Amino acid sequence: MTQYEIKAPQLLNQTIKLPASKSISNRALIIHALSEGSILPDNLSDCDDTEVIIDALHNKPYEMNIKAAGTAMRFMTSFLSVKKGEEHVLTGTERMKHRPIGVLVDALRQLGADISYTGEEGFPPLRIKGQQLKGGLLEVPGNISSQYISALLMIGPTLSDGLTLRLTGKIISRPYIDLTLWTMREFGAEADWSSYETITVQPKPYRERTYYIENDWSAASYWYEMVALSKNRDNVVRLEGLMDGSKQGDSSVRYIFSLLGVKTTFETTEEGVPTTVTLRNTLHTVPRLEYDFVNSPDLAQTFVVCCALMNVPFHFRGLSTLKIKETDRIEALKCEMRKLGYVLRDVNDSE
């Protein structure tokens, strides 16, 4: 077996061009396709989720294999349900065929969608026959994946009666729902919260427009981690293409890492303008980190590793959705951290 030895540099002084936001890219692509426009959004992410959506939308094969891309599976399920006159089978990897999709399928069926399972009930593959859906009032649990909710919202403007989506119980990942609504409005939709638990989407078609995707705050988290671990005031990392006031849920990384000593400085704070962000280590760290990741669960892994290496005790909550990703991320964290000598304990699969 080949072994590699990785050594940290003596000094960090780098400018990094981050990848485009996967979350915004995937939403913008679906909305662009629903607008039936010809101007593809600019600066799209090159991640697997985005690539399989681009391929499916461009080639339109009868059987669409979205591989291990969970976002693509959920967004394309809704999208194909409103493509009048088209029929497709939506499938993926073996792991994807064991990831539940029944909540979304049931909700779409309530709106009139023609979707059937070709294998095990409640799981992909799906056979979807697109048609004009009526819309109206729909209730779903607020604690389901925000991708299910976003998938339903994005087709709202195409429904004859629009969509009134009522979320029952505790609402998790609200920033991702807000990101979807914001992206929809960028393309002309009338969609917003009408009460704490209800979202109203008017039956107003999307309009085509040029659109530039800002860079990814999730990708920024690893550079924040490097600065936090560097323990040197002279170290500096510059990240290009980020926005102050970003709607990305993972933009909370700047606040959380401030608790671990990383200072964030924006070149400009003009709204809607991507700019360069400078990171420095102040060497001031909280003695213990407590945080609820319910609104940004994908950041949890970065902070588990970072806190462990910094010897900062931590207690993280809001991690229930990590169990049903492309792998069980909580078990993977426990397994890999154990190899480094750290013992993690999870409670109720959510903290």
What is the predicted function of each stretch?
Residues 1-351:
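Short, structured segments at the rim of ligand-binding sites
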